[in-house]
Amino acid sequence: MDRVLEYEIPSEYDGANITTVLKQHFKISTNLIKDLKKYKEGIQVNGEHKRVVDLVAKGDVLKITIRDTVSENIVPTDIPLDIVYEDEDVLVINKPSNMPTHPSMGNYENSLANGVMYYYKSKGEERVFRAVNRLDKDTSGLMSVAKNSYIHARLGEEIQKKELKRKYMCIVCGDVERDGTVDAPIRRADGSVINRIVAPDGQRAVTHYRVVKRYGEYTLLEMELETGRTHQIRVHMAYIGHPLVGDWLYGTEDHNIAKRQMLHSCYLCFTHPITGQIMEFKDEMAEDMRAFIEKLS
């Protein structure tokens, strides 16, 4: 599905070439500029097709059309979605636990991507599924989905620049004495596709945690990610001796205690790439985590 953006050229870009405007104002990547050049409607000024080397003048209207296709390898599946926010560019969804973000081997039709593609199809929209902040299968809560490649790239830049803020609530084993930060590099474990470990040759990973309440053998924490490595919170908390309750991979699996790792994405904040508005979303703790806490109280 096409996304059309228009911009009236101000005096600061009077006499500039289109490439300059695309990169400085729209912050469009070189790869996306190449895509825009492939079709006539990609770049227009005052309704006429233009090249990126052409110059613009104050008062000109620059229009770009971002063309999208459809994720043909993702089967649209009628899965109920808890949509927290939606506009022309972004979806914010409250993902339940026991639902992977993407399809995988042996699970082709029951992921969030399948549900989102069905939702797009029901609205007559052809789009590619583009998750911005991916959540693990058994992690619940807020996550964002970009509706086109431009928004996906811009929000990805916000993550790289640490401008997109994410906070989580989790329940860990043991009595965590005080707030703290784990700054420990993470990499994939040798011989494993899934398992991650702390290792000197890993990628830098930083997790901040705050004690919300202690329950003797367990502690409720608020987590804030400075980086976004796979399984980062789970790996870091296990590394300091406080694995997440119910984490079968990095802690102890006991379905009598918890059926999944007690981790919920409760806060998401980013700057909207089109409007410049600060988008802030909050969600309370997941119901199963709340029930677990109530049993401890």
Q: What residues fall within each predicted segment?
A:
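RNA pseudouridine synthases
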Residues: 1-297
